[in-house]
């Protein structure tokens, strides 16, 4: 039975005088029996014709009148053909319970407004031959029965001045309603490229039939969603060659493309929706029980009944994708599919000349990542016309971040790739530089990934619903790998950006792991599976949520290009301050902003000078892939890096397990200490990246627990194994500098271990100094100050004890108020201590009112030297170095918040971290069950049978749903927090011993020093002098290292500019001889601007 699907209001029987205009976008839909080019009408069966979308009715061919009758608005009362079919040959109309609901006219958002002089859409209808040689029979009932009978849907009496918009005039819109990039209505510049030709018939299942009737689309949408991989497929444009708008309109008129697509919706009762034309057997029967009319009465007709009032009503044009079983040829025994991209995405792509732009490649990986290459898996960069060398391999790790964090990172990466392609004078990059860059997104767990993030990936063409399978021939799938070269990007506002905004193609690999196996396993997929297949030069690691600067990735890559000894590099991590710095109003965000800034000004430059950076942050770092490789025996940086993934139970001690909580620190150490090599790590100031920092107390405490424990144990590991440095190929000077750095780290480690006692002692001596009657600020002979000090001292001790209880028995998420209250009390103690320090300093400077003694402002063993000079020098170095790096604003916007929360950094975070050293689990219990929710690929030999989307319309339906979800900001229900997993007794017992020893050590130090110097003045307190001057000395050491780093960078820039200048000054001696020595200097300075320009390149 032939049928074109649903028509629009401008379909058969539409008019301009009554009824609404039709929708704007239509796709042609065909069944297997359609034959638009047939000249004769076979007899024997009735014909199902176009459907009126507005009221879901059927109109037979007999209602189509001649052109002259329509122009005169004359409606014939009755039309009949010579042949009336039998009951069995009449068309089938579905019953009420199987029909789909279509929204009313007022619900339509897109209306096509035709001009008054345009012809009706049914003036020149396509010829539709009835099957089996039958002839047409009119089902027109006449005006009387229309009025008196059941309420038949609206049908206009005239079609003057209205017609359906042709397919070629459709301009796809963004998810926010604006014109998409590249369309004539787009506001982006003047980018007007021709729209794609009308898609081929989507419902043809026979390639020969499609080719015979539509030679233009031969080799296109002729068969399944899955196509075989071969050289011929690369040269075939599955959507037809590009054409201009006039040719598109000609084809639409020639092949009757004015009819719209079939609209399928879910059943109001929640049952499975199906097409009215899905079953060919149904169209050869007559069903009229709903109307109660005789099957032989042609004057009767059935109606569709009232609109359902309850149940889910789908939007018009949206249907759930239909799945069908298909037989697929395996490639090397593995499931590899080439899937067509959605039609709408294809419609605004600037390039469609390669299969990487028109097809998404899916691979079901059933092996461990270490065996990816050995099992014969290949990526697109290894096969066919897309075989390329990879210079830069970018890894973006993801857990359950939403679509805003993902698009913020991904859009920034694509803008960086555009910068690579803009460097036309580079020997490595250029217009086709994107072919040397591959972006790999690794998501940790299929059931954990955020649904809207999947929608964002689908909108870019990288992901498609309904393709993945749980198992292939009874082998469990470990990861689902999607490959596509996308040409569009979504910014953080979920708006499409394309070539008109400078976006270049981006080769993407999306690895969706079946199980949640943590970030370390994601990096194993990146390095051992995909990295081994691509063999890149430089690998860049990013976290979802981090937004690198516009040229950050280039500066990061340039560090490896200019120095062959660089094995790893990192950039500057900035806290995301929000619009106009609004996030800095949160003290937590402001304190972290100050911490990040001072670390990037003092710590990272110092360590970069020595050549060993203790940690390259996973949020923005890069490694030379060759330097990461293991030796012939299998030992090396990567083997040690991934060792932490297999640590469970008593097979690993707590020390080793906690050390691998900061696995990136282990990787840094293994690179520098690699036997027989001279690798160094470098900090790149020009590389910046913004990341969202925790803005709530529970998130902040939980994050720092892993950081502090990992950093502490990794530092101990590097100090214990410092002798490995002598087995490397570093120069003697480098080895000496590294030992100096080890000594610096040892002192830092000791201060960290005793930080709790040092904080208490500093508070005890400075705040207790106000209790002296000679210094009392309240003029009460020290009584008021003594009372305040005793209260705060007891509160501080009790709060520290309470902190231990909280850390041992409560999660931060379950005790939010208690953790917040403790941080507030610590802030009050810090404010009072700061007040005491300032008052004592001022009192020391001013002369005493009770005596004629002059203030003691000389350097020596006094309060001025031990308190004022030491504290002022520390803060002064912070200001000086910040101004030296031309980045001082954090000193004015975030310094106060940091120093107020400093006791919480020392007490709350440190206590919670040490009390949770037992929490070293990497895996997820209960996640070793093979799931079957996706189905599987079952078969024998080289072929398997699996369920896939039936045709292109089903792919488009899933894509359209993803765009609607992103546009409407569809909320995802929050996943309830699962119960805490039981920790092993072994870890808890070791945790207890460690916490007790740490607490006893700090308590002993605090009590001993407070008793020894309890009655001494501040100027005579040796321990206080030691603490303050040690802090000042460490700050000075960091400042010297930072200054050295800045000087080295300056010299390097000058040397690089001078070398470039020499390369561009051919014939310098001839110039000297011609102008003389006096003029050479002036000419040399005149070329300075040119040299600086070359250096910037």
UniProtKB/Swiss-Prot annotation:
Localization: Cell membrane
Region named Disordered: 1-46, 148-217, 259-322
Pfam families per record: Chitin_synth_1, Chitin_synth_1N
Entry's Gene Ontology cellular component terms: cell periphery; cell septum; cellular bud neck; plasma membrane
Basic and acidic residues bias spans: 299-313
Enzyme category, top tier: transferase
Cytoplasmic compartment spans: 770-786, 843-865, 916-993, 1047-1097
Compositionally biased region (Polar residues): 284-296
Topological region Extracellular: 1-748, 808-821, 887-894, 1015-1025
GO molecular function: chitin synthase activity
Catalytic reaction equation(s): [(1->4)-N-acetyl-beta-D-glucosaminyl](n) + UDP-N-acetyl-alpha-D-glucosamine = [(1->4)-N-acetyl-beta-D-glucosaminyl](n+1) + UDP + H(+)
GO process annotations (BP): cell wall organization; chitin biosynthetic process; mitotic actomyosin contractile ring contraction
Stored InterPro entries: Chitin_synth, Chitin_synth_fun, Chitin_synth_N
Glycosylation sites: 55, 416, 424
Transmembrane segment boundaries: 749-769, 787-807, 822-842, 866-886, 895-915, 994-1014, 1026-1046
EC number: 2.4.1.16
Membrane topology: Multi-pass membrane protein
Comp. bias intervals (Gly residues): 8-19
Main location: membrane
Function recorded in the entry: Polymerizes chitin, a structural polymer of the cell wall and septum, by transferring the sugar moiety of UDP-GlcNAc to the non-reducing end of the growing chitin polymer.
Protein name: Chitin synthase 2
Gene name of this polypeptide: chs-2
